[in-house]
Swiss-Prot record:
This is Serum amyloid P-component. It comes from Mesocricetus auratus (Golden hamster). Ca(2+) 1 binds at N81, E158, Q159, D160. SMART domains: PTX (SM00159). The keyword Acyltransferase does not apply. GO terms for cellular component: extracellular space. InterPro entries: ConA-like_dom_sf, Pentaxin_CS, Pentraxin-related, Pentraxin_domain. Binds 2 calcium ions per subunit. Keywords: Acute phase, Amyloid, Calcium, Disulfide bond, Glycoprotein, Lectin, Metal-binding, Secreted, Signal. It is found in: Secreted.
């Protein structure tokens, strides 16, 4: 009897864990953050956990926010803004690595779907930016740095500490989808393929096999914006 109860307990625990940490093919779907808050977010669990000397992150976002907001927040256990993608305003993005940031500017339309990619190479410190398949100006930061592992990766909020410290005035409101991350710098040809909807086997975060945890009022819905809508800005 005790053995049966023990097995039942293990089964219930396993079920709860599966609900909390789902691995799902999210092709054609988006995370929707419907409101400004400090409680609504999605935690992403990486497939590969290692210190990073190179990376590429790509995703699609659709929002009508005009205030500053976080798009991708990756914090290490010790330190702040280990890897942060932040949007200050229309046509202005910030990339932070090891709590040092750089800004990039370009042409965007308000409340238009955006496909965004950024990559960074430690050996040169060069960060590249691509918006709707078009390259923006390259910048440099944190040459020789290594992005720490064991991250807390959050969508919908900006972390001021490891896994928390949220501010509703920095929260994201809108849709995020097709988020993938690699431990390498993708070539321009590969970036264009990703922009066209080819994921190219991401090994850190894979939208087609994503581990995530939903928190607060965040939901999954079919993507209503066609991929062709992301090439309005050229």
């Amino acid at each position: 009897m005790d053995k049966l109860l023990s097995l039942l307990g293990v089964s219930i625990l396993a079920g709860l864990l599966l609900e909390a940490f789902a691995q799902t093919d999210l092709t054609g779907k988006v995370f929707v953050f419907p409101r400004q808050s400090e409680t609504d977010y999605v935690k992403l669990i990486p497939r590969l956990d290692k210190p990073l000397q190179n990376f590429t992150v790509c995703f699609r976002a659709y929002s009508d926010l005009s205030r500053p907001h976080s798009l991708f927040s990756y914090n290490a256990e010790y330190g702040e803004n280990e890897l942060l993608i932040y949007k200050e305003r229309i046509g202005e993005y910030e990339l932070y690595i090891g709590n040092q940031g750089t800004k990039v500017h370009g042409v965007e339309e308000f409340a238009s779907p955006v496909h965004f990619c950024t990559s960074w190479e430690s050996s040169s410190g060069i960060a590249e930016f691509w918006v709707n398949g078009k390259p923006w100006v390259k910048k440099g930061l944190q040459k020789g740095y290594t992005v720490k592992n064991k991250p807390s990766i959050i969508l919908g909020q900006e972390q001021d500490n490891y896994g928390g410290g949220f501010d509703n005035y920095q929260s994201f409101v809108g849709e995020i989808g097709d988020l993938n991350m690699w431990d390498s710098v993708l070539t321009p040809e590969e970036i264009k393929s990703v922009y066209q909807g080819v994921p190219l086997e991401p090994n850190i975060l894979d939208w087609q096999a994503l581990n995530y945890e939903m928190n607060g009022y965040a939901v999954i819905r079919p993507r209503c914006v066609a991929l062709s809508s992301y090439n309005k800005i050229s």
